[in-house]
């Protein structure tokens, strides 16, 4: 299950509106395909990117903060592939986060469960 929350609040002194968008429990749903024949599109980080891009365009990039609450490294074929199959290339997860423009990403319990080898590659 993917969680998306949007908060808006006012900052005093010079009035400014900051939009905070958070994701969490993505569990490897980086792309909108489930890799199973006959299944349609699903909610993914690419869906979130489309929303965040439109929000950044509407209110200004500097007024949007994008955060992830962890649990991104397990649960999908793409995550499994980069965790355990193709371990000779840079892990895809940091590149996905950079592509989306995340401001901060924290580690969840399922991210640690992948093991030290995976965790070290993600942090390299």
Predicted segments with their positions:
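N-terminal catalytic scaffold of extracellular/periplasmic and nuclease hydrolases
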Residues: 12-124
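C-terminal segment of classical bacterial N-terminal signal peptides
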Residues: 3-11
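Accessible peptide chain termini
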Residues: 1-2, 50
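Generic low-polarity alpha-helical segments
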Residues: 2-3, 37
């Amino acid at each position: 299950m993917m969680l998306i929350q949007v908060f808006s609040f006012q900052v005093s002194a010079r009035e400014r509106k900051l939009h905070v968008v958070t994701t969490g429990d993505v569990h490897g749903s980086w792309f909108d395909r489930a890799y199973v024949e006959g299944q349609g599109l699903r909610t993914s980080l690419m869906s979130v990117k489309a929303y965040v891009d439109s929000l950044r365009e509407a209110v200004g990039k500097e007024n949007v903060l994008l955060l992830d609450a962890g649990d991104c490294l397990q649960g999908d074929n793409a995550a499994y592939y980069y965790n355990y199959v193709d371990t000779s290339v840079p892990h895809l997860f940091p590149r996905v986060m950079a592509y989306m423009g995340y401001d901060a990403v924290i580690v969840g319990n399922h991210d640690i469960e992948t093991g030290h080898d995976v965790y070290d590659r993600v942090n390299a």
